[in-house]
Amino acid sequence: MSATLTARQLAAGHGNVELFSGLDLVVAPGDVIGLVGPNGAGKSTLLRMLAGIDLPERGTVSLSPPTATVGYLPQERDRRGGETVREVLARRTGVAAAQRALDAASVALERGERGADDAYAVALERWLGLGAADLDERADAVTAELGLTVELDRPVAALSGGQAARAGLASLLLSRYDVLLLDEPTNDLDLVGLAMLEDFVLARRAGTVLVSHDRRFLERTVDRVLELDLPQHKVNLYGGGYAGYLAERETQRRHARLEYEEYAETRAGLEARARAQRAWADKGVRNVRRNLASEPDRSIRAYRVESSQKQAAKARQTDKMIERLEVVEEPRREWELRMQVAAAPRSGAVVAVLRGAVVRRGPFTLGPVDLQIDWADRVAITGANGSGKSTLLAAMLGRIALDEGTASLGPGVVVGEIDQARALFVGGEPLLDAFATVSGLLPADARTLLAKFGLRADHVLRAAGTLSPGERTRAALALLQAAGVNLLVLDEPTNHLDLPAIEQLEQALDSYAGTLLLVTHDRHMLEVVHTTRHLEVNAGTVTDLG
């Protein structure tokens, strides 16, 4: 079904903070709109409003035709207990809800309830439109194409991380919503999955709104960009795709800064002139009063009085010019992380060694691996989901026991790590206390550092486990700045970070002088971060590509 979603004058806030207002958006068939903005700007909030899950503080959201389907597919951090892969696919494609509605309509039809015929027709049309009739057949084909070889009746809780990522992508590829809303669909996808997702989005004839931190994905898919500019409290819609958005935004910001600087310079000049004119007027008045009695010439006395009055009039005239100036507000500068990785003393020449290392986990086997990481190696590690990248890191760091072989870290190695699960800050202890304990900082210093990473009072006093993955990632990055490291291990560090933070992280990695192990599927990061070695992991086999 061809459908158009329209938002008019939407407004939303969080507590006393307004996120956005006056937001207008039309999502027509074939549109692919990228939604960008810093963490906390309201991107997920807006998607939930467009989906009809949350109500806006002001404004309306309408759908034409009203019977069209809208699919909101967020990232699901936790797997639902007892739910099978097949049930996940049915739920996230909307088929499960459509089946329940069709079953209820069938019962009403059998009972001969008033309006049951029309209700059944609507329910059946929705069931068919969402692809329920052939979901099982399509699910078998899509999961096979993705390499998800598990039985679809297997509980999702039993899946590996790579398998769970493939199941999530399968639910997206199987969806047939009339309007699709995607919240960070690229998280946890490998390069093959990213390519399949790009093809899916580009082939859709229905409208799509998506949030993503993957710059290559945005460049290749979106035709418009809606920016939630939190620092300026503005909503901006740009045409020309993601590249056009970046260019136009830079031009706008440059013009806004120049316009403000011109206004500020003009105002400062007028204010200086007014001060000088008032000073001359005041000086003239004092001189007139002092010399008036001693000056016998009446015309000279009149001239001096008139001169001081003219200076006062000029000052008033300049004040009016200042009042008539059209005020230009100073553009607010974006929050900048300005991160640096604190350096520890250099380690020994050999940083990490695996000799004949084998790790077995059920049917999966990593190795045998023979590998040596030397001081100042900058290693990119790539491979498909489930190929063993995270297992390789854990083996090198001694986080897991080997079934065969040996693993060792060299002398003087100090590890700084961001793991894929963001498991460092997950307990019930307040973030501030947990961070101070791990970092060794005093609470006041820990609070200051966390604030630099966008984690303020309402974050640091909450239980660490209640923070979002993005907030936990920021806390982990702050820890890297607090504690000196000489072996930096990053497993999918861009997941859950916004674009400004990712760019700051890339700059920090560029200046980092120690040893680096980087696992990422972010194609832009792989291009801009300097690496000296490339390890490829494929089904448990590690190949050093040099």
Stretches found by the model and what they are:
Residues 115-141, 258-364:
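Flexible nucleotide-interacting loop at or near the entrance of a catalytic core
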